[in-house]
């Protein structure tokens, strides 16, 4: 069987599995966020933090909860990294010194669900930091994203109220009832597939295929690997990330990791449909996500399987930076999934992708990561796009736009438009400043279009909370640590505040009955319109920069 055929089977089985779990997992998450029953563990947590689980919050109080929790998390993780040398399970001789700027960058990175890593995990962070710091944030940062998405859905579903739920309840439920159970099962499957799970502080000896001995650091890898993918975090225990055989040993575990990356994102539209009382609306949103996902994955495989250049022509594909145990097709599917979500994990070297393959990964992030996007953030990003789409459609027919019975008034469209201005402003401004500073240009391993692509990729990844990188950029400097940390923080929390403000504005409205002029938002026509608006918005915003970077490199 050729690698291309194997890759197509890999993709077909993946799609079939995602379709199979869409309804049951989506319905389960609907019950999690709508039930009035609390688990005993949850009631204990609420008592400890002084939360009344039955009280609800306005959008402002909900946003303050998100910001307060995230701020405390950043401070805790920042301090934990700086003092790890005095704590148990620390590395006695770390290869990279944890400076304040690197600790800031890493703390913001994991709290914002970005997991940008300007260091080698296995030689910089001790096991206690990995478990009590980074892995914990892998859970709760994703739970924050799901909570915000659910709050926006409540804004569409509720009528004439200022309340959107309780952030602390949504946070705890998302962590304990959704992320933790799936992670336990996934970790067992990864260990069964060959991923390691131990507490070896020092190097463990392994035998290579050539029969020689090699020493590699061990650690609690499988437990962190599963939540890294499931919660679309992406930060690896090892510098090689999911290309490392201790994290991702076989083609089977590679398939499982891609499935984990996509499963919650593609199931949340079902939750949305159930919560607004119309499952067809959820199918429409899922169809937009699926269309963009398959389109991107198809282009990625096409560009990576083209035989341009001497070496690719000789081996039949662009094999540079690709693990032979996965092959080009499987790695292409992984690369598309990890950049269409906010994951950023890699099983191949993205800096070694073909120029157009690298452009696809950047374009995926610049879409706003909505196909299916990050855990929670993909759904609320897609719903904001739906709001913009009905506004554009309303302009064409000359009537006030409506979505799910809610009028899209000037306030709502201003909030939606502002949401999609945040990330481009951060990406383009950050890239321009970096290219204007001689010292930061010196951090590029390549000159010309590919050098620009390295910097553009870094700010695109940071602002969209992805975390993957073109490895040719030396990012562990005071300037990049600070600038990318700010990009991650603003790229995460400004959109969240705007989404919650939009949810609050929608919740205060009554319901507008459908009329003959109401745009049906559950039909293929609307699916095509949302996909078209998404592609047009991104093309108009980023095409000039892409033309100077990967497109120019591809033409050359």
From Swiss-Prot:
A GO cellular component entry from the record: plasma membrane
Pfam families: KdpA (PF03814)
Locations listed in the record: Cell membrane
GO MF, one annotated term: P-type potassium transmembrane transporter activity
Domain of life of the native organism: Bacteria
Entry keyword set: Cell membrane, Ion transport, Membrane, Potassium, Potassium transport, Transmembrane, Transmembrane helix, Transport
UniProt keyword Ribosomal protein, yes or no: no
Annotated InterPro entries: KdpA (IPR004623)
Annotated transmembrane regions: 6-26, 65-85, 133-153, 176-196, 249-269, 283-303, 378-398, 419-439, 483-503, 526-546
Primary localisation category: membrane
Keyword Membrane included in the entry's annotation: yes
Quaternary assembly: The system is composed of three essential subunits: KdpA, KdpB and KdpC.
Function: Part of the high-affinity ATP-driven potassium transport (or Kdp) system, which catalyzes the hydrolysis of ATP coupled with the electrogenic transport of potassium into the cytoplasm. This subunit binds the extracellular potassium ions and delivers the ions to the membrane domain of KdpB through an intramembrane tunnel.
Similarity section: Belongs to the KdpA family.
HAMAP family given in the database record: KdpA
Protein's name in the database: Potassium-transporting ATPase potassium-binding subunit
Organism: Mycolicibacterium paratuberculosis (strain ATCC BAA-968 / K-10)
């Amino acid at each position: 069987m050729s690698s291309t055929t194997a890759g197509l089977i890999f993709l077909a089985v993946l799609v079939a599995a995602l379709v199979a779990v869409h309804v049951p997992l989506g319905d389960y998450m609907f019950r999690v966020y709508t039930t009035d029953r609390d688990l005993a563990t949850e009631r204990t947590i609420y008592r400890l933090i002084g939360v009344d689980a039955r009280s609800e919050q306005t959008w402002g109080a909900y946003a303050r909860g998100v910001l307060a929790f995230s701020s405390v998390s950043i401070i805790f993780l920042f301090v934990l990294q700086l003092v790890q040398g005095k704590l148990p399970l620390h590395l006695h001789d770390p290869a990279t010194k944890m400076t304040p700027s690197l600790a800031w960058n890493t703390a913001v990175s994991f709290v914002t669900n970005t997991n940008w890593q300007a260091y080698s995990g296995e030689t910089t962070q001790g096991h206690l930091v990995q478990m009590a710091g980074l892995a914990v944030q892998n859970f709760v940062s994703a739970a924050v994203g799901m909570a915000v998405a659910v709050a926006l859905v409540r804004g569409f579903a509720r009528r004439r109220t200022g309340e959107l739920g309780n952030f602390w309840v949504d946070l705890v439920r998302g962590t304990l009832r959704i992320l933790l159970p799936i992670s336990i099962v996934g970790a067992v499957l990864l260990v069964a597939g060959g991923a390691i799970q131990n507490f070896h502080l020092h190097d463990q000896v392994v035998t290579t295929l050539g029969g020689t001995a090699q020493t590699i650091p061990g650690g609690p890898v499988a437990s962190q690997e599963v939540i890294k993918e499931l919660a679309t975090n992406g930060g690896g225990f090892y510098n090689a990330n999911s290309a490392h055989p201790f994290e991702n040993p076989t083609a089977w575990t590679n398939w499982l990791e891609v499935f984990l990356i996509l499963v919650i994102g593609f199931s949340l539209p079902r939750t949305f449909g159930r919560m607004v009382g119309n499952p067809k609306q959820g199918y429409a949103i899922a169809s937009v996500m699926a269309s963009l996902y398959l389109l991107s994955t198809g282009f990625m495989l096409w560009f990576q399987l083209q035989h341009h250049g001497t070496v690719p022509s000789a081996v039949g594909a662009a094999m540079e930076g690709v693990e032979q145990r996965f092959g080009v097709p499987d790695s292409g599917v992984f690369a598309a999934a990890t950049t269409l979500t906010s994951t950023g994990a890699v099983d191949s070297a993205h800096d070694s992708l073909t120029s157009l393959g690298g452009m696809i990964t950047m374009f995926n992030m610049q879409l706003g990561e909505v196909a299916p996007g990050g855990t929670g953030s993909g759904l609320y990003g897609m719903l904001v796009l739906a709001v913009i789409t009905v506004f554009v459609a309303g302009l064409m027919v000359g009537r006030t736009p409506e979505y799910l019975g809610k009028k899209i008034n000037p306030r709502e469209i201003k909030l939606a438009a502002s949401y999609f201005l945040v990330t481009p402003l951060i990406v383009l401004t950050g890239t321009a400043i970096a290219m204007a500073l001689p010292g930061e240009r010196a951090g590029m391993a390549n000159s010309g279009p590919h050098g620009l692509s390295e910097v553009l990729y870094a700010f695109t990844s940071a602002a969209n909370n992805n975390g993957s990188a073109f490895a040719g950029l030396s990012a562990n400097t005071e300037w990049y640590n600070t600038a990318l940390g700010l990009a991650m923080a603003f790229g995460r929390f400004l959109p969240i505040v705007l989404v919650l403000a939009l949810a609050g504005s929608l919740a205060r409205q009554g319901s507008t009955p459908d009329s003959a002029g109401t745009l049906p938002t559950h039909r293929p026509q609307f699916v095509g319109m949302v996909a078209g608006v998404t592609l047009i918005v991104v093309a108009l915003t980023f095409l000039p920069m892409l033309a100077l970077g990967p497109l120019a490199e591809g033409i050359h």
